[in-house]
Structures are given as structure tokens and as C-alpha cells.
């Protein structure tokens, strides 16, 4: 639970995310998704309750084992793509040799290698999100938290971004992603729907479809 001046933004939420799955937190703006992820990553303290990540009750203890992409682009706009990657690599304590090897590998994975000398400020919205994803991969996280990574991104870039998430997941990375888009719920192993700080339902997309008592029409 999280309260701000007697306003409850996350209300008695209980979740278990299984290793190796893509877990989606779906809900409209103001549902509490960002607050939830900030609590999970240790950026924000809980008002009551506890969080356990990778066997640790304190996320600080396992900070080096998970990655986080915030909703707002937070890298350096006046640095190039490669310079941003090198800075993040050095913050994680990687050697220059490791940074050089990892940077080429990760920029290749995210299709950003041809743009390695472009300033981050000059990237499109979709490419900025790819850069944020790449930066978070510099320490090979076991769990990756992504807060609405495709919001405001064009449909083609959204599809490419999800393809990269699938590749990461196949390599063993657990993905926890929030989104306001209902169609992205279909891409997840399991989905939790959040509204006004409360989890209303949680299950696989297939089971949730079967439980829905009305006809579903896709346009």
C-alpha cells in the first residue's frame, strides 16, 4: 500500500511474478502503475506491506540484478547513443573493454548501431525508448521493469520494441511491464488489470478472455 497525504494510490496490492514470464500491469493513467513500479524498484518506499525481489526483502540488496526503464526518457540528450551507453556501463562498474564489447552487442540487438554517433536529443520517440532499453541491459539484468515503454511511440516502433522484449524473455530475462494499451495485454504471459490503485483481476490473457461474459469484437 502507498499513501500520499491520506490519498491511497496503491491499495493493498498482492502480486507474485514468476521467474521467466512477461508480466503485464495494465490500466489507465492514474491507476497506480508508475507508483507500483517505483515501489518494486526501491525508488519509493511503501506505506505498509512488504516487497520481496529475487529472494531479498530490500530491493537495494539486489539492485545490480534488475533493470528499470522509467516512463520519461532520462538519459543524456547532449550525448550520442554510444556515449550514453558508455556512461551507463561505467556507472555499473564495467571495465572499458567490457563496455566496448557490450555496447556493440546491445546496440546491435536494439538496431541502434547505425545511429551510435547520433545525439540522443535527435532520436525519434521510438529510438529513444530503444536507447533506454539498451542502457538498462548493460549489466545483464535478471528482471527488467519497464514503465509504459511504448506510450506515445508509433505502431511500427511499438511492434519492434515488443519483439526485443520477446527475445530478452527467451534468453531468460523476466519482464515486468506496465501499459495503458489493451492490445499489449495479449503479448504478456500473465496480466493484472489495475484501476484506482486496486488490482481488479489477474490471469493469463487466454483465461481472462474465457471469463469475459460478452462478445469481443476487434476492429
Residue ranges and their predicted role:
Residues 119-123:
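Conserved ABC ATPase signature
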Residues 41:
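Helix-to-loop junction immediately C-terminal to a conserved catalytic motif
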Residues 144-147:
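Catalytic Walker B motif of ABC-type/P-loop ATPase nucleotide-binding domains
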Residues 48-62:
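Conserved ABC transporter NBD signature motif
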Residues 86, 90, 97-115:
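Conserved ABC ATPase "signature" region
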Amino acid at each position: 500500500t502507498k499513501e500520499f497525504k491520506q490519498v491511497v494510490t496503491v491499495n493493498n496490492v498482492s502480486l507474485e511474478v514468476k521467474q521467466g514470464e512477461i508480466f503485464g500491469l495494465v490500466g489507465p493513467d492514474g491507476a497506480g502503475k508508475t507508483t507500483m513500479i517505483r515501489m518494486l524498484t526501491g525508488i519509493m518506499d511503501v506505506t505498509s506491506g512488504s516487497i520481496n525481489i529475487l529472494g531479498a526483502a530490500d530491493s537495494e540488496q539486489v539492485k545490480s540484478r534488475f533493470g528499470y526503464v522509467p516512463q520519461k526518457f532520462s538519459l543524456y540528450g547532449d550525448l550520442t547513443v554510444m556515449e550514453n551507453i558508455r556512461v551507463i556501463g561505467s556507472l555499473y562498474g564495467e571495465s572499458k573493454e567490457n563496455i566496448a564489447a557490450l555496447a556493440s552487442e546491445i546496440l546491435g540487438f536494439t538496431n541502434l548501431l547505425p545511429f551510435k554517433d547520433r545525439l540522443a536529443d535527435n532520436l525519434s520517440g521510438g529510438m529513444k525508448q530503444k536507447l533506454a532499453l539498451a542502457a538498462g541491459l548493460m549489466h545483464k539484468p535478471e528482471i527488467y521493469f519497464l514503465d509504459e515503454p511504448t506510450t506515445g511511440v508509433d505502431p511500427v516502433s511499438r511492434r519492434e520494441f515488443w519483439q526485443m522484449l520477446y527475445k530478452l524473455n527467451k534468453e531468460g530475462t523476466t519482464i515486468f511491464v506496465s501499459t495503458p494499451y489493451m492490445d499489449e495485454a495479449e503479448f504478456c504471459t500473465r496480466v493484472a488489470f489495475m484501476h484506482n490503485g486496486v488490482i481488479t483481476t489477474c490471469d493469463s490473457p487466454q483465461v481472462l478472455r474465457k471469463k469475459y461474459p460478452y462478445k469481443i469484437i476487434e476492429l
